[in-house]
From Swiss-Prot:
Name of the molecule in the record: Tubulin beta chain
SUPFAM superfamilies cross-referenced by the UniProt entry: Tubulin C-terminal domain-like, Tubulin nucleotide-binding domain-like
Organism expressing this protein natively: Pyropia yezoensis (Susabi-nori)
Acidic residues bias locations: 431-440
Family statement: Belongs to the tubulin family.
Broad class of where this protein is predominantly found: cytoplasm
Length: 458
């Protein structure tokens, strides 16, 4: 089977990861000790994508739990689902990264990384046909960002032909946990641009807004936010774990969503989202789900897709859904909102359908969009970064761990390049391409004009 090895790093990554395992264990009918208590054969049909069947029929998650301090991992071990995981798969340091990317990437994290890779290797060897890895982490702290990206690059080195997807929690515009978030995030993005195949951008503020405005929770807490994220994670992988009419896997996902290798930062959404008690009053049709799925208020990253254009998008429907209806809706949304889609990629929306709905729903949909509006996040982080870096504020914490200022400059320019690439593709049009060809034929263009990038129409 096409297995996925899951790695969670740092406090945020472990909390999101733990919630994800709760959600999919429930879907597969696996209780907190790993025993199967489900009711349908479909639940076990492809459970081995995420679970290893141990002795005595126990299902053990293919999960590696990593942190540089033992606190969060101890909480997970002692929690109601602690018995689910393989005890050897917990790898904890003692010192913590103290929100310092350099500690996670170069000093403390580097000491621990070999023992983590041993566990990852063992999990990978236990797979028949490993499809790839998924990592949950945040980019604002020390362990998730520093050590998380170190793991991503080491795994990429060792398994160059396997997919690498990350669920990365971006720093929020208004809710900031630490002052050095812009540094940690920029250094991480610099790594993810090079070493990941797909990065799903999540941010706490957007999640707060969804909980507060859509789910009508007056005081959203982290478990509420993590539940939202795990809903999308479960939706994206549903067609790998259950039979469906239009299947998908991590590689298909990347092939359909990434038009240029560096542009693999996606925004994600989920439908249906409705407040408790209102669910019964809402009609659920494919049209409703599509409408909610493409609603900017539904995006789990704080950037408005209306400010940019979609290069590509993917929709994952679950439940008793007609494939024909799904394709009609996808076609309709592109025709109706043609201004929001790039005109030089026709049929930009890929759909997949899985027959098994999530627990407690009749149908649901997860959404992934590759939109040029994601540059808002990078611009915001970049401006905070340059404000601090200009004055060399807080730099001594990083240089003290052996980092060089050059690395900061490189990371900053890599992120700025990413923003300008996104802007360039947003402005490019089909006419621009044709114009370029005419110029080329007429031999008017200077020798140094490059044709790699789309020519921008005047």
């Amino acid at each position: 089977m096409r297995e996925i090895v899951h790695i969670q790093a740092g406090q945020c990554g472990n909390q999101i990861g733990a919630k994800f395992w709760e959600v999919i264990s429930e879907e597969h009918g696996i209780d907190s000790s790993g025993a199967y208590i489900g009711t349908s054969d479909l639940q076990l049909d492809r459970a081995e994508v995420y679970y290893n069947e141990g002795s005595g029929g126990r299902y053990v998650p293919r999960a590696v739990l990593v942190d540089l301090e033992p606190g969060v991992l101890d909480t997970i071990k002692a929690g109601p689902h602690g018995g689910l995981y393989r005890p050897d798969n917990f790898v904890a340091g003692q010192s913590g990264a103290g929100n310092n990317w350099a500690k996670g990437h170069y000093t403390e994290g580097a000491e621990l990384v070999d023992s983590v890779l041993d566990v990852v290797r063992r999990e990978a060897e236990g797979c028949d046909c490993l499809q790839g890895f998924q990592v949950t982490h945040s980019l604002g702290g020390g362990t998730g960002s520093g050590m998380g990206t170190l793991l991503v690059s080491k795994i990429r080195e060792e398994f160059p032909d396997r997919m690498m997807c990350t669920y990365s929690v971006m720093p929020s515009p208004k809710v900031s946990d630490t002052v050095v978030e812009p540094y940690n995030c920029t250094l991480s993005v610099h790594q993810l641009v090079e070493n990941a195949d797909a990065v799903f951008c999540i941010d706490n503020e957007a999640l707060y807004n969804i909980c507060y405005n859509t789910l009508k929770k007056p005081e959203p807490a982290y478990p509420d936010l993590n539940k939202l994220v795990s809903g999308v994670m479960s939706g994206i992988t549903s067609s790998l774990r259950f039979p469906g009419q239009l299947n998908s896997d991590l590689r298909k996902l990347a092939v359909n969503l990434v038009p240029f290798p560096r542009l693999h930062f996606f925004m994600i959404g989920y439908a249906p989202l409705s407040a408790d008690g209102v669910t019964a009053y809402r009609a659920k049709t494919v049209a409703d789900l599509t409408k909610q799925m493409f609603d900017p208020k539904n995006m789990m990253a704080d950037c408005d897709p209306r400010n940019g254009r979609y290069l590509t998008a993917s929709a994952y429907f679950r439940g008793k859904v007609s494939t024909k209806e799904v394709e009609e809706q996808m076609d309709a949304i592109q025709t109706k909102n043609s201004g929001q889609f790039i005109d030089w990629i026709p049929n930009a929306i890929k759909a997949s359908v899985c027959d098994v709905a999530p627990t407690g729903e009749t149908m649901s949909a997860a959404f992934i969009g590759n939109s040029t509006a994601i540059q808002d996040i990078f611009k915001r982080v970049g401006s905070h970064f340059s404000a601090m870096f200009k004055r060399k504020a807080f730099l001594h914490w990083y240089t003290g761990e052996g980092m060089d200022e050059m690395e900061f400059t490189e990371a900053e320019s890599n992120m700025n390049d990413l923003v300008s690439e996104l802007q360039q593709y947003e402005a490019a049009t089909v006419e621009g391409e044709e114009e370029e060809d005419e110029y080329a034929e007429g031999g008017v263009v200077n020798g140094d004009q490059s044709y790699d990038e789309p020519y921008q129409a005047a």
